[in-house]
């Protein structure tokens, strides 16, 4: 048996408590890296979209509460931008779902809360891009499901993904109809 004086033991105990506190306060390791990288991919894509928009004369500030698509501009760029953004955002939501599932048994409330915080933060630039009530979708889902549990995070992610898929489909179909007048709703549902 290893002999240990009180001071060493107390220091080891403090260190163990500190490490446990740090772990319980948020995401760590590969999970943190994956989710933060995925969230950054969204902001990078939105920045690229806004840069492209400026070059094409599209004014995102012209968005109104209910007019955030082709009603604001005849230019299909806005529709394309939303399709691009929702594609990247859905990858982020899938990453959240996978990581929450991995941590279902061993994760802490701090880790799940950090996942929710990331989802909420990511919803802001998506909303500024014209995806209506994205932050409300995420926060409303958190009111119905505890964001400090794996199941709560999975339910919030599900609501977020459903919203993204609806927006993606709507904008994709509208874009295809503008490109090809023979493109029907039925064809859209099958794509």
UniProtKB/Swiss-Prot annotation:
Phenotype when changing residue 34 to K: In strain: 297, LP7 and Sh-2-82
Protein name: Decorin-binding protein A
Role of this protein: Binds to decorin which may mediate the adherence of B.burgdorferi to collagen fibers in skin and other tissues.
A Pfam family assignment: Decorin_bind
Impact noted for substituting residue 140 to M: In strain: 297, LP7 and Sh-2-82
Keyword field contains NAD: no
Top-level division of the source organism's lineage: Bacteria
Phenotype for residue 37 to S: In strain: 297, LP7 and Sh-2-82
GO cellular component, one term: membrane
Stretches of the chain forming a coiled coil according to its record: none
Signal peptide: 1-29
Family that this chain belongs to: Belongs to the decorin-binding protein family.
Protein keywords: Plasmid, Signal
């Amino acid at each position: 048996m290893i002999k240990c004086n009180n001071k060493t033991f107390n220091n080891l105990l403090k260190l163990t408590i500190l490490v446990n506190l740090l772990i319980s306060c948020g995401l760590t390791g590969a999970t943190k890296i994956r989710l933060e990288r995925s969230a950054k991919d969204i902001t990078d894509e939105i920045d690229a979209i806004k840069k492209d928009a400026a070059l094409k004369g599209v004014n995102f500030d012209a968005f109104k509460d209910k007019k955030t698509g082709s009603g604001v501009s005849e230019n299909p760029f806005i529709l394309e931008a939303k399709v691009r953004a929702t594609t990247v955002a859905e990858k982020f939501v899938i990453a959240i779902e996978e990581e929450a599932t991995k941590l279902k048994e061993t994760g802490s409330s701090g880790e799940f809360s950090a996942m929710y915080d990331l989802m909420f933060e990511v919803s802001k630039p998506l909303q500024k891009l014209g995806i209506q009530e994205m932050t409300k979708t995420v926060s409303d889902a958190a009111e119905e499901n505890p964001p400090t549990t794996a199941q709560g995070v999975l339910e919030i992610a599900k609501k977020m993904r459903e919203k993204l898929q609806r927006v993606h489909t709507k904008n994709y179909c509208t874009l295809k109809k503008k490109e090809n007048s023979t493109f029907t709703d039925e064809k859209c549902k099958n794509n």
